[in-house]
């Protein structure tokens, strides 16, 4: 790791200060004199460096220095947003607290000082040193800044001890470089969004809690410091159940020269809540009126999937338009199709439901979806629509059904030439929509739909909401002329803007930026490949078979895996000819080659191997019997933002055909 010159000199200065504080130089001089007296033979002229190092180590000086310096590479667990602004998350080290701080800006220092009453983990035994255990991770977002705590073992009283430095600023013109005062900060209504994630021993993540912290109480506290007890509630069906308590300390830096009275702060917060409640009430009145008018067009509209409100992870009803917003990926994603691939490799998991019955509704806020790294079809569709809007496309989320009448959400883009394109967010596939004419002559050739969608009830984005009022809600017969009010009933854009525009209400969750991947693709690819080799060898050993690996054949599989991912990202196939030519050269006459590629969105080698064995063709390769059998396996991990990844694996074998 290379440091810029100014950082290197700063680090040297800190180390020098610490060494001076410990009087290390004086102790070294004492030990040097003592060593010369005791160990230098009369015929020796000088001590070697190695002799001195041994003496220092023997007397514990080196250990003392290392303990005092206490390098904390792991404690600075931070993620960089796609915007240039760097966020800082750090531990309790006082030296770190004083670095990387711009003295001309205002900061809020948020410390998490442990947790308690996580009763689900009351009986959890304390993990042994080195033992893999389930962990909690706290993720934060505040005004385009993302933070992540160190993972701590799950316990009734989890040992959270992290600090996060949040910059508080106004984006308005002229205020960018001015330090925010108390009055300015009181007008910044953005909450701190905190998401608690549990990761089990297999790497599976669970959303435990999602909490919006109102931080402005610190503006009315003495010395600009306050301690809070935050009760975290569960998600989904458990949104009324407490899952645990966090102890939080808030501190303004630099300290406020003038604090506000608590009465002023409380009045401002109450006024904001009142305004938000009134806007939401007026929108609800309007939505009810719109729905009545929609049903008057045709009574059968009552059975269509027209989704105006949806519950988030905390069980709060929000207008669906608030789940979508133009989202720019910075330099993390280059094209709309690459964005579709990124959304596709995020895991798919339906919201958990206790007991039987229908599907549990849970449209996650974007931070909860990204931190958990998986979600339902609506979460994927909302994110993909937001990214496509960021690329300047006219994109909408479609709500309807697919085969067997299962509710589903997907994305639609409208081209300037009238082309309607469906994007399936769970697979990355795209389909051109060509409507069939139900009144056409029986023998007339009609376009055959390739997409899996059956009906469509409504479409929406951050500015528009339209209900399908055509005679049939079948997708194949739908005309997507969204300006034709006889086919699509629109909601008032002003009404939507009043509750869904950025900053319109204080209850609107802000959209976080995407974070770059923290996964090293080469290292991870190699690790999974080594694990798979071991699993294959053990499996064949159980069958009484020997295993001979051919590294060159494994290497030749790389272009194929790269080609498969390129095709998924661009819909263009390339490089297959060179791969086939190389394989023909590598397989001698009279030998047979077999290959089996497979794709995963997780990095668990054992789980992937078990899945591969369920394929008869793959099992045939792994359990290959014959003369001169040579096996090969190649793994290629392709990383995407938010540490999402596409994992391509190819098993192959070549053997001499014996007839």
Curated annotation (Swiss-Prot):
GO BP annotations, alphabetical order: regulation of centriole replication
Presence of the UniProt keyword Cytoplasm in the record: yes
Chief localization: cytoplasm
Entry-linked InterPro entries: CEP76, CEP76-C2, CEP76_C, CEP76_N, CEPT76/DRC7_peptidase-like_dom, Papain-like_cys_pep_sf
Subcellular localization(s) per the UniProt record: Cytoplasm, Cytoskeleton, Microtubule organizing center, Centrosome; Cytoplasm, Cytoskeleton, Microtubule organizing center, Centrosome, Centriole
Phosphoserine: residues bearing it: 75, 83
Membrane-crossing segments per the record: none
Subunit structure, interactors included: Interacts with CCP110 and CEP97.
Function in brief: Centrosomal protein involved in regulation of centriole duplication. Required to limit centriole duplication to once per cell cycle by preventing centriole reduplication.
Protein name: Centrosomal protein of 76 kDa
């Amino acid at each position: 790791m290379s440091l810029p010159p100014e950082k290197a000199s700063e680090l040297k200065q800190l180390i020098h200060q610490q060494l001076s504080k410990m009087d290390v130089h004086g102790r070294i001089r004492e030990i040097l004199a003592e060593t010369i007296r005791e160990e230098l033979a009369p015929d020796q002229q000088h001590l070697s460096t190695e002799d001195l190092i041994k003496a220092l180590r023997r007397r514990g000086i080196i250990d003392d220095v290392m303990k005092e310096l206490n390098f904390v590479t792991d404690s600075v667990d931070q993620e960089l947003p796609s915007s240039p602004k760097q966020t800082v998350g750090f531990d309790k080290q006082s030296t770190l607290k004083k670095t990387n701080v711009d003295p001309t800006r205002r900061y809020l220092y948020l410390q998490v000082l442990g947790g308690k009453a996580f009763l689900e983990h009351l009986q959890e035994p304390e993990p042994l040193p080195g033992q893999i255990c389930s962990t909690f991770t706290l993720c934060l977002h505040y005004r385009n800044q993302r933070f992540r705590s160190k993972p701590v073992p799950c316990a009734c009283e989890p040992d959270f001890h992290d600090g996060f430095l949040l910059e508080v600023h106004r984006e308005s013109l002229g205020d960018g470089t001015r330090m925010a005062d108390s009055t300015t900060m009181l007008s910044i209504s953005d909450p701190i969004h905190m998401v608690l994630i549990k990761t089990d021993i297999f790497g599976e993540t669970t959303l435990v809690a999602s909490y919006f912290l109102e931080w402005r109480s610190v503006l009315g506290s003495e010395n600009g410091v306050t301690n809070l007890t935050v009760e975290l509630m569960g998600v989904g069906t458990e949104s009324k159940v407490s899952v645990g308590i966090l102890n939080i300390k808030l501190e303004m830096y630099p300290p406020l020269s003038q604090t506000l009275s608590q009465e002023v702060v409380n009045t401002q917060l109450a006024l904001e809540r009142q305004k938000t409640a009134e806007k939401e009430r007026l929108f609800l009145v309007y939505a009810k009126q719109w729905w009545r008018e929609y049903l008057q067009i045709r009574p059968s509209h009552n059975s269509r999937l027209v989704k105006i409100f949806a519950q988030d992870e905390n069980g709060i009803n929000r207008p669906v338009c608030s789940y979508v917003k133009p989202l720019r990926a910075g330099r993390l994603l280059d094209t709309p199709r690459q964005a579709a691939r990124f959304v596709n490799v995020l895991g798919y998991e339906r919201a958990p439901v206790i007991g039987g019955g229908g599907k549990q509704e849970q449209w996650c806020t974007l931070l909860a979806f990204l931190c958990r790294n998986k979600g339902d079809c609506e979460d994927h569709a909302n994110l993909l629509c937001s990214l496509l809007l960021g690329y300047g496309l006219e994109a909408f989320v479609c709500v309807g059904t697919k085969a067997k009448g299962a509710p589903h959400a997907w994305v639609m883009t409208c081209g300037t030439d009238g082309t309607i394109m469906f994007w399936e967010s769970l697979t990355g596939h795209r389909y051109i929509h060509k409507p069939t004419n139900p009144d056409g002559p029986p023998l007339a050739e009609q376009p055959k739909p390739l997409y899996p969608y059956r009906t469509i009830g409504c479409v929406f984005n951050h500015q528009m909401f339209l209900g399908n009022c055509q005679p049939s809600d079948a997708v194949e017969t739908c005309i997507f002329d969204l300006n034709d009010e006889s086919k699509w009933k629109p909601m008032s854009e002003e009404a939507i803007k009043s509750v869904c525009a950025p900053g319109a209400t204080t209850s609107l969750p802000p959209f976080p930026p995407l974070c770059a991947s923290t996964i090293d693709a080469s290292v991870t690819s190699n690790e999974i490949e080594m694990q798979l080799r071991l699993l294959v060898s053990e499996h064949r050993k159980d069958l009484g078979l020997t295993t001979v690996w051919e590294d060159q054949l494994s290497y030749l599989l790389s272009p194929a895996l790269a080609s498969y991912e390129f095709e998924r990202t661009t819909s263009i196939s390339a490089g297959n000819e060179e791969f086939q030519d190389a394989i023909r050269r590598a397989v001698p006459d009279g030998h047979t080659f077999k290959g089996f590629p497979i794709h995963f969105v997780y990095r668990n080698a054992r789980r992937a191997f078990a899945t591969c064995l369920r394929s008869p063709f793959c099992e045939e390769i792994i359990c290959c019997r014959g003369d001169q059998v040579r096996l090969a396996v190649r793994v290629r991990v392709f990383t995407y933002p938010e540490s999402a990844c596409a994992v391509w694996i190819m098993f192959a074998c070549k053997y001499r055909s014996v007839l």
